[in-house]
Amino acid sequence: MSSEQEFEKPVIELRQKIADLRAFAMERDMDLSTEIKKMEARLSELEEEVYANLQPWERVQIARDHERPTTLDYVDVLFEDFLEMHGDRLFGDDKAIVGGIATYKGKPVTVIGHQRGKDTKENIVRYFGSPHPEGYRKALRLMKQAEKFKRPIICFIDTKGAYPGKAAEERGQSEAIARNLLEMAGLKVPTISIVIGEGGSGGALALGVADEIHMLENATYSVISPEGAAAILWKDAGKAKKAAESMRITAPDLYELGIIDSIIPEPRGGAQRNLHQQADEIDRLLEKALTRLAEKPVDVLLDERYEKFMKIGHIPEEAATTGQ
């Protein structure tokens, strides 16, 4: 079961009332189907009201849900014959990033993604989804292998950010991230990145220099967490909600800004409500995107990728002069 957020309380309470009424009807052998149907209709309306008008901070909470599907959850549903590969051939194997080769619709692909845990024990093993340099170097090794064998690359982004510890810095965290940005820009195969949860800072961008970038409806993508931004701007991490509203970190915001290519719909309440329904949405997008990119010559692919990232952050001159 996914964790319950404050804004979901009215929905959760009504669901519980319906469950209680069903149990009461069965226990007393009473026909309360009419009353239950009315309550279910109200529940549907209430879910629409709550989930169709989510605020940025509420989306942050959904993106952080500990039951939200991870990279490996999607790999299990979307791909066949997945063979996980380990190690960066320089230091070790970072379990905060998983990757390997797989089959998608009968064709070979390389799949890479951040991997967080779903409980404390697993999160410790996977560094809470925050990679060390060896994780990014493992990812790059797999990308270069994919380029060699002409396999498309599919990346799943889901991290609060790169691991901030002393050992990670000593082993070249910033260099590893920068190297990935450089190398991904020049990969001669189609690349697709999908933000499935949190997309935090350079730790996310190291898997995000792709031909197409897509986001799940309730995912976030930002240079810093709302708490971090609040601590810097107002010296108070408790103002994270205010920061989230100002940062434009949600999928609708980023689509409007031209940073992402599409928004992938989620089930009501988030991807954690129905893994297979969410995977179906991703599947439809992937099939179309891979077909679209496969038709492009390598030089066109590289030119369009370059132009895509050069446009990010660009403000048209007329907008700048009018203050818009």
From Swiss-Prot:
What does the entry list under GO cellular component?
acetyl-CoA carboxylase complex
Q: Which reaction does it catalyse?
A: N(6)-carboxybiotinyl-L-lysyl-[protein] + acetyl-CoA = N(6)-biotinyl-L-lysyl-[protein] + malonyl-CoA
Q: Give the top-level enzyme category.
A: transferase
Provide this UniProt record's keywords sorted from A to Z.
Answer: ATP-binding, Cytoplasm, Fatty acid biosynthesis, Fatty acid metabolism, Lipid biosynthesis, Lipid metabolism, Nucleotide-binding, Transferase
Question: Which residues are in the CoA carboxyltransferase C-terminal domain?
Answer: 42-296
Subcellular location as annotated: Cytoplasm
Molecular function (GO) terms for this protein are: acetyl-CoA carboxylase activity; ATP binding; carboxyl- or carbamoyltransferase activity
Q: EC?
A: 2.1.3.15
> Which GO terms of type biological process are on file?
fatty acid biosynthetic process; malonyl-CoA biosynthetic process
- Entry-linked SUPFAM superfamilies: ClpP/crotonase
The cross-references to InterPro entries, in alphabetical order and at most eight, read: Acetyl_CoA_COase_a_su, ClpP/crotonase-like_dom_sf, COA_CT_C
Pathway membership of this protein?
Answer: Lipid metabolism; malonyl-CoA biosynthesis; malonyl-CoA from acetyl-CoA: step 1/1
- One matching Pfam family: ACCA
Looking at the record's lineage, which domain of life comes first?
Answer: Bacteria
Which cystines does this chain contain? none
- Coarse class of the primary localization is cytoplasm
Q: Note the subunit structure.
A: Acetyl-CoA carboxylase is a heterohexamer composed of biotin carboxyl carrier protein (AccB), biotin carboxylase (AccC) and two subunits each of ACCase subunit alpha (AccA) and ACCase subunit beta (AccD).
Similarity comment text for this entry: Belongs to the AccA family.
Q: Which PANTHER family does this UniProt record tie to the protein? A: ACETYL-COENZYME A CARBOXYLASE CARBOXYL TRANSFERASE SUBUNIT ALPHA, ACETYL-COENZYME A CARBOXYLASE CARBOXYL TRANSFERASE SUBUNIT ALPHA, CHLOROPLASTIC
Q: Name the job this protein performs.
A: Component of the acetyl coenzyme A carboxylase (ACC) complex. First, biotin carboxylase catalyzes the carboxylation of biotin on its carrier protein (BCCP) and then the CO(2) group is transferred by the carboxyltransferase to acetyl-CoA to form malonyl-CoA.
Q: This protein is called what? A: Acetyl-coenzyme A carboxylase carboxyl transferase subunit alpha
Naturally occurring in which organism (per UniProt)? Shouchella clausii (strain KSM-K16)
- The protein's gene is named accA
